[in-house]
């Protein structure tokens, strides 16, 4: 089930993101970058982020399997539990926000993808538009898809 993240979800969502960064993203980013990202997604930071963008979670039997954020026509904060990657959770979350964006009148959706997720976005129909280097958070790849 996909629903909007609520206050009582903050600790579980933060833990999911932190675990995903350590398990899945650490092969593409050095430990300093991963540490910076972990700090950026603490429960208190997530609370602040949720004030400016909608954050959704995919939940099953009380377990948070994934999370995704949407602000205007941009995807943010998209993470799937490492043991659920490749199971369709990511596809379900991304299609959920694509449908929302489409209903809101957006013609395209964009994302600053981690290096780890580029192949997933490509498979979902996203096209590479450029790259950015951030000293604190590492390299990302801008990708977009027409809706």
Task: Report residues per predicted region.
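Conserved acetyl-CoA-binding loop-helix of GNAT-fold acetyltransferases
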Residues: 86-99, 123
């Amino acid at each position: 089930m996909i629903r909007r993240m609520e206050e009582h979800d903050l600790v579980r969502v933060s833990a999911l993101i932190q675990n995903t960064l350590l398990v899945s993203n650490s092969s593409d980013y050095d430990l300093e970058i991963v540490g910076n990202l972990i700090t950026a997604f603490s429960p208190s930071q997530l609370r602040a982020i949720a004030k400016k963008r909608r954050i959704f979670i995919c939940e099953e039997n009380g377990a948070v399997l994934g999370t995704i954020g949407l602000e205007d026509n941009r995807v943010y904060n998209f993470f799937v539990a490492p043991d659920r990657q490749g199971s369709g959770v990511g596809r379900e979350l991304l299609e959920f926000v694509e449908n929302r964006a489409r209903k809101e009148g957006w013609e395209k959706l964009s994302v600053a993808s981690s290096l780890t997720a580029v192949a997933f976005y490509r498979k979902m129909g996203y096209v590479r538009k450029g790259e950015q280097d951030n000293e604190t958070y590492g390299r990302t790849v801008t990708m977009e898809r027409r809706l």
